[in-house]
Structures are given as structure tokens and as C-alpha cells.
Regions:
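Extended, charge-rich alpha-helical interface modules
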Residues: 1-81
Length: 81
């Protein structure tokens, strides 16, 4: 997957997240399904940003960015920030 494809997915997920959160503001709050979807979006965004950072780091180091792999959510979600 190319950087542009990753960024496109990030943008689409961010738009969906904003749409869901806006709907929640217009109503009493998020439904259980909406809340679950927002949580899933956040995890997938973390995974995609991690993949993009890996690709950029490999490129900067003179390595092939295509060898970067999307990490499991359990790994990415446990990164310390």
C-alpha cells in the first residue's frame, strides 16, 4: 500500500469519525453501535498512522518502505506516547 492510499484511508476514517461524533452531539449521545464504531475507527487510525510512520522511517533510512507491515491492534494500542 502506498503512502497516498494510507492517507486516503486515514482521511476517510477521520471523516466518518467526525460524522458519527456530530450525530451524537445532535442527539442525546451515541448509540452503542456508534460508540463501538468510533472505538474501532480510533484503533484503525492508530494502526494506519503507525504504518505510515514505519514507511517514512524506512524510506529515511534508505530501506524499502514497502517492507513495512501493519501491526496488530494489541501492539499498537499498547504503545506509550
Amino acid at each position: 500500500m502506498e503512502d497516498s492510499e494510507i492517507l486516503s484511508q486515514i482521511n476517510a476514517l477521520t471523516d466518518e469519525e467526525h460524522h458519527l461524533l456530530h450525530e451524537g452531539e445532535q442527539n442525546v449521545g451515541l448509540t452503542d453501535d456508534q460508540h463501538a464504531r468510533v472505538s474501532a475507527i480510533k484503533v484503525e487510525l492508530d494502526r494506519l498512522w503507525d504504518l505510515l510512520r514505519q514507511r517514512r522511517a524506512r524510506r529515511h533510512a534508505g530501506l524499502n518502505p514497502a517492507t513495512a507491515e501493519e501491526r496488530d491492534a494489541t501492539i499498537v494500542e499498547n504503545f506509550k506516547q
